[in-house]
Amino acid sequence: MGEPGGAEAAVSARLLELAADDNAAGLGELLAAWPSLADEPAPWYTPARGAEPLTPLMVAAVYGSVGCLDALLSPPYLVDPNRASASSLSTPLHLAAAGGSASAPAAVSRLLAAGADPALLDHLQRRASDLVALPPNSLPLKNHLLSLLGARKEWPPDPSLPDIKNGAYASDDFRMYSFKVRACSRAYSHDWTECPFVHPGENARRRDPRKYHYSCVPCPEFKKGAGCRRGDMCEYAHGVFESWLHPAQYRTRLCKDGVGCARRVCFFAHTPDELRPLYVSTGSAVPSPRGALEMAAAAAAMGMGLSSPGSSSFTPPLSPSAGGGGGGGGGSGGGGAWPQQPSVPALCLPGSAGNLHLSRLRTSLSARDMAVDELLAAAAAAADYDGLVASPASIRSARGKALVPSNLDELFSAELAAAAASRSPRYADQGGAAFSPTRKATVLNQFQLQQQHSLLSPRAAAVTPEPVSPMSSRLLAALAQREKMQQQTLRSMSSRDLGNAASLLVGSPVSSSMSKWGFPSGNPDWGADDEELGRLKRCSSFELRSGAANGNHEPDLSWVNTLVKEPTPEKMMTTTSAMDSIGILGQNTSRDHIVGGEDDTAGVISSWLEQLQLDEMVV
């Protein structure tokens, strides 16, 4: 590590000596071996300044070494002529004017031709023209030097340079987002003030407002001249170019000179038509995020479509000067050598509404997109379905929960229990007709047709509907499953009375409690005592239990007495076998419920009722 650093220091010191002696040949040979040291400073001692780190170009300017200046300012080195010393902020132009060399005017001419800025100030706020030091007998030479430093350099017309006052380079988008932001690609010396691109060491350099989110307010630290400690990450503008070319402030005020303005790049509008809109909420040409959100909400409420998802509400309108001249001065045909710059995207500041996904406003199906007849049909279907439910209080409590298989027993038992309370033993009420398979199929078909009609309607054709919610899909599946269960139960019944009892058992709490059948002691007991047989004899049909529970009058059961007789020992064995089958069936039902087979509950009940009916017929 020490040897390479010492070698570079020795080479840098040797370069300074060659530049002071104006040895252009030796300087070129050494730079060919060490090209990276062409613009590297090294300590140099002068009687007036003492030891100060200077570059080879600065030393050549002090001693008026014109040959070395030409070598350093030409390709392939292209040393920056505006680089300032770290200690005194002196540029090569300051050193050439204060050097007192006889060839100082030639050195100053070389530096000005390379783009040196005579308006730069040193640490004492002095220009290069303030440091001219020549003997008294060299008054003509001094006047010539002052004329070079005081007068603005007039460059010959360069057709390759774009016209910054006309064409695409004078448009609002280019001025706000590209002027003095993009690096210049020219390898030869030219007038920086006529070039719209940034150069190394140029004071007009700007940060890209699309990359660095800063405001148009000037930075208080940068204005003091000491530089900002935050650098490019500062939230304030550094310099007049960043402040006045900011999209929030550019051309929001009228120029005091009007159409007679002679500035090459003016930050103000020259006619009222060139003024960019100023938003009162922010005091600038950029709307506030709250205003943008309110505008987007208003557009959505009015049914206004957005042009594209990527369009930003911050895009300011282009001024009329975007396509034509922005002032005087003829165009110089720069468009042929320089291609047109692509359109710059709109500014997207933090928290802007442009970052929001506004496409969701177009994909939500609301009542605005449905016709009046569709709304009436949907409301009628909802009211019809609510009218089918017998117990509104219990169903409202069930709707508040997720529709899962564990809630189906609760949901359907509440419906059927309320319906059974108002029925006669022979289906005297009309509530059963509302729960008939034909009625439920009609309601489901009407609901599906309404959904298809709403999707195919002209107003909803341009809107992408959201997927059906899980609640509605589960409700439809539950209704279809319940219809299937009732159809299977009704097909398996052989009498109207048993059908009534089965319809009550499917959704009643008895069905949910069947899964808990078992033996309290844990050991199976397949025997039957006299009390159980007597209870079986007295309760030969489920309708008797239903009627007794509801307080209804007992119907005529004379036809049952003809079938029921006193049991004999042989028939006792038959009854015991029937009870064995019932116990095994209860175990299977409990096992199916544990595994998750609630869908087969209706089939289990129907098989159990058929077996019971056959046993009664045998008895």
UniProtKB/Swiss-Prot annotation:
SMART domains: ZnF_C3H1. The keyword rRNA-binding does not apply. Keywords: ANK repeat, DNA-binding, Metal-binding, Repeat, Zinc, Zinc-finger. One of its GO terms (molecular function) is zinc ion binding. Residues 308-341 are annotated as: Disordered. Residues 322-337 have a biased composition (Gly residues). ANK repeats lie at residues 52-81, 88-120. The keyword 4Fe-4S does not apply. Signal peptide: none annotated. PROSITE patterns: ANK_REP_REGION, ANK_REPEAT, ZF_C3H1. GO terms for biological process: regulation of gene expression. A zinc finger (C3H1-type) spans 213-241, 249-273. PANTHER family: UNKEMPT FAMILY MEMBER (PTHR14493), ZINC FINGER CCCH DOMAIN-CONTAINING PROTEIN 67 (PTHR14493:SF123). This is Zinc finger CCCH domain-containing protein 67. It comes from Oryza sativa subsp. japonica.
